[in-house]
Amino acid sequence: MSRIGRRPIALPAKVEIQIDGQHIAVKGPKGQLSRSLPPLITVQQNAQMLTVSRLNDSRPARQLHGLCRTLVANMVDGVSKGFERRLELVGVGYRAAIQGSKLVLNVGYSHPVEIPFPPGIQIAVEGNNIIVVSGTDKELVGNTAARIRAVRPPEPYKGKGIRYLGEQVRRKAGKSGKAKK
């Protein structure tokens, strides 16, 4: 049994919390985030610590306890440090560029693929082949990075495509030619 929900969340000095019933708002140097929590979960603030507790020991309350604690901890980390995902383009002629508020990818299709940024996300391109997705909301950063990767996921034969930096692509052997008679 996991006991993640019982661990208190330490608040950095520059982070402010507002708890209004089931709604929690976190404000810090990088921005602000807010979220509504389920009615089975409560959050209390004691000095520079947050504790997440459940109202009863029912199965749904136990399931949500660790989840909500982690979501609140990610909100605190996001407004204080921020989150970042890096993607790498692998392939001849594969390029990324930023035009206005869109990421433009040339990844082997007959046309460039344009991906608009969601609000709260910053995208930067290092060189021609490294894309850096950053922001305060961990879920939004991950979803945006996954949407970019889904444009051209890495293929198993040559390894070309868009992958997370450091991702291992499982390679397959190509088809072996038939023996001639």
Curated annotation (Swiss-Prot):
GO terms for biological process: cytoplasmic translation. Keywords: Ribonucleoprotein, Ribosomal protein, RNA-binding, rRNA-binding. One of its GO terms (molecular function) is rRNA binding. GO terms for cellular component: cytosolic large ribosomal subunit. This protein binds to the 23S rRNA, and is important in its secondary structure. It is located near the subunit interface in the base of the L7/L12 stalk, and near the tRNA binding site of the peptidyltransferase center. Part of the 50S ribosomal subunit. This is Large ribosomal subunit protein uL6. It comes from Synechococcus sp. (strain JA-2-3B'a(2-13)).
